[in-house]
A protein has these predicted regions:
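Long, amphipathic, heptad-repeat alpha-helical coiled-coil stalk/linker regions
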Residues: 119-123, 143, 150, 171-173, ...
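Amphipathic alpha-helical coiled-coil segments
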Residues: 76-79, 141-156, 235-242
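Regulatory alphaC helix of protein kinase catalytic domains
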Residues: 21-22
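Positively charged n-region of N-terminal signal peptides that target proteins for export
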Residues: 1-4
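A glycine-/polar-enriched beta->alpha junction
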Residues: 26-35, 46-63, 77-81, 85-88, ...
Length: 277
């Protein structure tokens, strides 16, 4: 029976060597996408600085430089959030696989003890060959389940190590609370795609403001105003669609947390049952 990874995990936890999730999340800063996004922010900040120092700059030049920096910062936040999400998912998989493995270890111990007891009963005439076959099947199934859990743990640990290096997760003691209701609006405000659309709209409006109706052709003005109206409609539609998705996910958080609590209770009940047996 394979036990080394589960036993090692227990030993590391007992020695205080398990590492908490907040420490793992710090590794997100080292993700390639985050590093590249940070370099882009630094480059756009330098571009803005040069633009502001240029005595010949126009209002449009400054607007574009500021927008470029703001968009780069939004993309950095997105890259960091995505990197953190990947770490959380991998970290959680390791914790879940380890807990499941510990339960299945107990299940195998119980199945093997039951098999030995059945073998003794068969010899004494207290059980039939069918009883023995059923006990053997239960032990075999328990062994197969534990082997699968072992492979799942190895896979989860490899995935986590690929993101943060060698890491022994510490179980999350307390579930996080629900975020504030204003989170949806904050996410909409920071969304890089919406920000890019807002920037494009602001740029078109700035270009329209620079057009002198005394000199610009009416068709050029109308064409620009049509672009502004079309982009405003596109922005409203994109924001509305994203808001619907975010609000749906926000509403799904309470039942999700409740499901986690119930799963924890079921796992604890299973552990106690196998320990009692």
């Amino acid at each position: 029976m394979k036990k080394p990874l589960f036993a090692l995990a227990l030993g590391l936890t007992a020695l205080g060597l398990a590492q908490p999730l907040p420490e793992a999340l710090k590794k997100a800063q080292e993700a390639p996408a985050v590093v590249n996004a940070r370099l882009e922010v630094q480059a756009k900040a330098r571009d803005l600085d040069r633009t502001l120092k240029d005595p010949l700059r126009t209002a449009l030049d400054e607007l574009q430089a500021r927008q470029a920096l703001e968009l780069a910062e939004a993309r950095l936040r997105r890259a960091l959030a995505q990197a953190e999400n990947e770490i959380v998912a991998a970290y959680t998989q390791v914790v879940e696989a380890r807990l499941q493995g510990r339960v299945l270890e107990k299940a195998l111990e119980v199945a093997e003890l039951s098999l030995k007891a059945t073998e003794v009963r068969v010899k004494g005439g207290g059980a039939t060959s069918l009883d023995l076959l059923e006990a053997q099947n239960r032990a075999q199934e328990a062994r197969k389940n534990l082997d699968q859990a072992q492979r799942a743990l190895e896979s989860a640990q490899a995935q986590l190590a690929n993101l943060v290096g060698p890491w022994e997760p510490e179980p999350v003691a307390d579930l996080p609370g629900l975020p504030e209701a204003g989170l949806v609006e904050a996410l909409l405000e920071e969304n890089a795609d919406l920000l890019q659309l807002r920037h494009s709209l602001a740029l078109l409006k700035a270009q329209r403001a620079l057009l002198d109706e005394s000199f610009a052709a009416r068709k050029d003005i109308d064409a620009l105003e049509d672009q502004i109206a079309a982009l405003a409609t596109q922005l409203d539609g994109a924001a509305s669609s994203l808001r619907v998705g975010l609000e749906a996910r926000f509403r799904g958080l309470p039942p999700l947390l409740e499901g986690v609590r119930r799963a924890e209770e079921a796992l604890e009940a299973a552990k106690k049952r196998y320990e009692a047996e």
